[in-house]
Amino acid sequence: MTPAFSYPEPQPEWPSWYSEYRYGAFYLFPPPDVMHRVNALRSHYDPTSAAICEAHVSLTVPLPRPLDVATLAHVTECLAAQPAFSLEWGPPRVYPGVPGVVLDIAPMERVSALVAALEGCPCFRGAAPRRYAFSPHMTIAEFVSEARTQEILAEVRELGLHGAWWCSEVVYAIPDAAFRFHERWRGRLGSQQGEG
């Protein structure tokens, strides 16, 4: 099968976890106003993460192989069968078990159903299992110490970081040779009464 996209060759300086993401994964990207606001926080508090990817909600484990036209068509059908929904973001909290500050994402049930549908597609056959239970979030800072985590949380807690957006699209993003993720494709969720 011919890949639907071009993919980077693993670079000698890449740590092993970079190579796991060579074929990308699926994400939710916030609308421009939320993206701008969260990107500014990421750049300030965790420039390492900010350099890798813009603000996002990680959905799936990394793809184990390139996407081809046939499997991309299957993903398109899968997404069309999932209803669009109102996604709530914020407030900030500490990510459980590891240092870092994230924005909560809800409703858990709707996002989890979307993940289960995506990871049930043929393109995920043979994918490495998820290391931790799925917990939807949008990261502000992750490559920080425990002490810095508490400082960041105290600073951002009063910024009114919460809201909602109409979640109607899923993004497929792939890293480049410098391990900077770029959007390569968007798939639409099915319509739902009240959309607009």
Residue ranges and their predicted role:
Residues M1-G196:
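Histidine-dependent nucleotide/RNA phosphoesterase domain, centered on the 2H-phosphoesterase fold
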